[in-house]
Structure formats: structure tokens, C-alpha cells
Amino acid sequence: MSPLEATIDPVWLIIVKVVILFVILLAWTIFNVWFERRVLAKMQNRIGPIMNSAWAGGVFQAVGDGLKLIFKEMLTPKGADKIVFNLAPVIAGIACFASWSVIPLGGQVSMFGHTTRLQITDVPVAVLFILAVASIGIYGVVLAGWSSAGTYSLLGSLRSSAQMISYEVAMGLSLVTVFIFSGSMSTSQIVESQANHLVVGGFDTHIAGHYWLLLIPSFVIYVITMFGESNRLPFDLPECESELVSGYITEYSGFPYGMYFLAEYINMATLSAVCTTLFLGGYRAPWPLNYFGVIDSGWWGLLWFFLKTQLVIFFFVWVRAAIPRFRYDHFMDLGWKVLIPVSLGWVLLVAAWRTVINQGWGRNPVFLVVVGVILVALIVWAFMGGKTDSTADEAPDEPFDAFAGGYPVPPLPHQVQAPLAGAATATTVARRDHDENGGL
């Protein structure tokens, strides 16, 4: 199927799809708010939300929160740039919805007498479009902090921009191997390419070749980076309450605050949907249900897609309840010093492997011998290479001066107290001389 075949629908059908998708996302957000609260309560041995409807498990509490934010007064801080301050939530809201236009929710179905796909549209660079929209969403965060005329808001927006840009690089690199294996950046074609059976040693396993299984390092890197992109625990540094009150949304209230609240949960669902599409087989039935063709086509794809995506959302909630917040320097070191180098090395390795397979070099014994020698040399160098003495260049510990900053600070257990200096030393010397001279 060509990626552009999904754009031949009548205009009225495209509008219907957009409206239905918009309603689904709003309802799904309400469900995910309730779902997160209930899961956190169960993991923390609490009751959780039961307000308004004990029989419904408290699901209407999320509805009440949304209505409350809609009707609350919208305040603008004194000194804020009013135009940019009000525009920032709109940018964040539009960006979180736009990515869903290229995410396939299912295969071909019959809708109002027309055969169509459960996807608004598809383009040859659909995944690149999703990454571009995510970059636009950063402006909604940066402009919110810059226009609020508040210290906490500005610091939160700067943290968020640095965090999202840093982890977007690693996320993009983790997806390159998916493009290499599928041969396309179209979301629908990537899903279809995962329907091929996994072949091991010439034996057909009849297991769908999902990329989470074939490209495990890429899958792990994407899962880590999606937490950084969504500003969720353990990477919620832009709005951590213990340091920045509420970060870049500190000065917002009412409907604009609700827009950021909505954008956070839709972004979480978007990243989960992208994970489902690129690594978990999309709307295809999981193994071994894929043996039954009846439940692996048509409207059944909608069920499998939402079940897989909800499973990833549950992982979001589980990590929030189980893992504490990272320190900022550790978080940035993880992105720049670990994830990006590992992603680059993995991309080179996968590209080289695909080249060897496509060119048929794997059958050449000379090539295999050369590769074996190189691998052995690398292993020997890694384990037998000279190691630098990490303690050789360390500077000796200097005596601790408790009055260096102007205030007395008690030394830590491993620090050495410096001798008294200045007036105190002079006074001590004068008293000693006075005692030695017999008081003269």
C-alpha cells in the first residue's frame, strides 16, 4: 500500500474522522487521569478516587476536575507578555493533537459505505512529521516560562527545553534502525512490515517480527527517552514541586492550565501510540492470536491498538510510582553521555549488518575471517588495554575554611579544619607573647 492511498477519502469523511478522533482523545484523557490515580492508589495501598460515583470507581472525579478548570478565573501576572502568555497553551494544545493525524489506529474498514483506513492521512515521512510536531510543542513550554515574568516559570521552561531537545536527539537516533529494517518512514508501512514472520536460521517461527524483539537496544532507548520527552517521573524536572513549585505552569490558572494538563496526558498517549506503532506491531493482533485471520483485520485492529497503547501507559504510571526523580546533572549525563553514543553505535552496527546481508558478503569466508579478527582485537583491547590511574591526577584535598563564604560552616567528616586566619591569629600571637614576657 502506498502511503498516499490514505488521502483519497472524501473531504466530509476526513472531517468525520477528525471529529471522532478528537472526541476519542478527550474521553481517553479523562479515562487515563482516572486510570493513573487508581493504579497509583493500588500501588501505594490507598483507596484512590471514589468521589461523586462510588459505583463507577471515581471516574467522574476527573470530569469534575476538567469542568472546574474550565470555569475558574484566568489570571495574568503583572508584567507578563499577555499575547505570548495566552498563545503558549494554544501551541501546546495544537501540537499534542497534530501527531495523531498520521498514526494508524487500524487497517481497512467500511465506514458510511466507503472503504477507508482507520487513519486520517499518511505521508512517506510520517515519523519525521511526528518528531517535527514534538519540536513545535517545545515552543509552548518555552514561551510559557518566558512570558510569565516569574523566576520559577523561567527556570522550569529552560529545564524543559534543554531536556526535550537533548532526549529528542536520542529518540530520533533510536528510530533510524526501524527505518533501516522497514525501508520506510511511513507509519502504515512500518506496521505492515512487522507482520512478516520471524525467520531464524532459515526456519519460519510463525512469530510476527515486531521490532521490539529484533531491535531491542532501539526499543529500550526509545522507552527511556519517551519519559524525558513527556516530562514525566522520573524525569519531571521542569515542574518538580520540591524545587520549582510547578515549573513553567506556575503562573497559569483556569482554562490555560487545563490546556497544559490535557497536553501532558495526550503527549503520554501519543508517545505510547508511537511505541505501539513502531515496535509493538501497531494494530496487528499479538502472538499467537495473529494465527486467526478473522481477528487480525478490520475493526479488530482498533481493539489491539488501544490495548497495546494502554499497556504502555500503564508502564508510565508504574514507573512514576516505583522510581524516584533523577538529579538534573545525572539526567543530562544519561542523555548525552550514554543514550546518544549508544544509539550512534547501534545505528552503525545495524547499517553494517544490513549491508552485509543485502550484498551477500556473509557467504564470503575471507570477509568472515576479517570480521572475526577485528572483533577479537576489539575484545582484547577492551579487556587488556591499559587503564589510566584515576587517582593520579586528583588534586590533594585543601584544608576546609569555614569562613570562606563569610558565614561559619561546619566541616564535613572528611574535611580538615584550616587554621584560624586574620584577626583571630594575630590576637592569639599577641596573647602568647604577652604571657612569655611576664605580662609586660
From Swiss-Prot:
Question: Catalyses which reaction?
Answer: a quinone + NADH + 5 H(+)(in) = a quinol + NAD(+) + 4 H(+)(out)
Which UniProt keyword terms apply here? Cell membrane, Membrane, NAD, Quinone, Translocase, Transmembrane, Transmembrane helix, Ubiquinone
Q: Which InterPro entries match?
A: NADH_UbQ_OxRdtase_su1/FPO, NADH_UbQ_OxRdtase_su1_CS
Cellular component GO terms held in the UniProt record? plasma membrane
A Pfam family annotated for this chain is NADHdh
Q: Name one GO biological process term.
A: aerobic respiration
Statement: the UniProt record of this protein carries the keyword Acyltransferase:
no
Query: What is the superkingdom listed in this entry's lineage?
Result: Bacteria
Using the UniProt record, give the first listed, main subcellular location.
membrane
Coiled coil ranges (UniProt) are none
PROSITE patterns hit by this protein: COMPLEX1_ND1_1, COMPLEX1_ND1_2
> What is its EC class?
translocase
Could you tell me where this protein is found in the cell?
Answer: Cell membrane
Cite a single GO MF annotation.
oxidoreductase activity, acting on NAD(P)H, quinone or similar compound as acceptor
Q: Where are the transmembrane segments?
A: 11-31, 83-103, 123-143, 164-184, 207-227, 261-281, 299-319, 331-351, 366-386
**Could you tell me the membrane topology recorded for this protein?**
Multi-pass membrane protein
EC identifiers of the protein = 7.1.1.-
Report the family membership: Belongs to the complex I subunit 1 family.
Known function: NDH-1 shuttles electrons from NADH, via FMN and iron-sulfur (Fe-S) centers, to quinones in the respiratory chain. The immediate electron acceptor for the enzyme in this species is believed to be ubiquinone. Couples the redox reaction to proton translocation (for every two electrons transferred, four hydrogen ions are translocated across the cytoplasmic membrane), and thus conserves the redox energy in a proton gradient. This subunit may bind ubiquinone.
Subunit architecture: NDH-1 is composed of 14 different subunits. Subunits NuoA, H, J, K, L, M, N constitute the membrane sector of the complex.
**What's this protein's name?**
NADH-quinone oxidoreductase subunit H
Organism (species): Cutibacterium acnes (strain DSM 16379 / KPA171202) (Propionibacterium acnes)
